[in-house]
């Protein structure tokens, strides 16, 4: 499937809701994601390549290859840097559950 740009960056679905799956798996290339949250979806980010930072509510986390981050539903989050990420979304349907809330300030 051809990648496209979403709130988090360039997305390439690997397993989708339309496949009948209970969860979705996406490959993301993130440079500067928009601040957002999900009402019904938990996410697990596995950093494959690159470095950056992630804002989880009011906490900033350094991102590097091999790191796994759990983002529960309801947590405002965004990432920035030069990142290649595998994201597992539970349950499936995350693209219908994205609620953008604007651009926050962040440290470099």
Label each residue range with its predicted role.
Residues 32, 40-43, 47-52, 57:
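Glycine- and acidic-residue-biased ligand/ion/polar-headgroup-sensing regions
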Residues 38-40, 81-82:
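Short glycine/proline-enriched turns and hinge-like loops at secondary-structure junctions
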Residues 50, 66, 85:
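Short hydrophobic/aromatic patches on the structural cores and recognition surfaces of FHA
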Residues 58-74:
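Short acidic-glycine-tyrosine-enriched beta hairpin
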Residues 73-98:
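Ligand-binding loop in jelly-roll beta-barrel domains
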Residues 95-108:
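Acidic/histidine-enriched, glycine/proline-rich intrinsically disordered or flexible terminal extensions
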């Amino acid at each position: 499937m051809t990648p496209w740009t979403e709130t988090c960056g360039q997305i390439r679905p690997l397993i989708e809701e339309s496949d009948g799956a209970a969860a979705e798996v996406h490959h993301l290339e993130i440079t500067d994601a928009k601040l957002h949250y999900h009402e019904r979806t938990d996410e697990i980010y596995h950093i494959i390549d690159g470095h950056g930072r992630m804002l989880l509510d009011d906490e900033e986390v350094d991102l590097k290859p091999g790191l796994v981050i759990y983002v529960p539903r309801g947590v405002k989050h965004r990432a920035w840097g030069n990142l290649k990420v595998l994201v597992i979304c539970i349950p499936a349907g995350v693209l219908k559950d994205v609620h953008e809330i604007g651009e926050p300030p962040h440290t470099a």
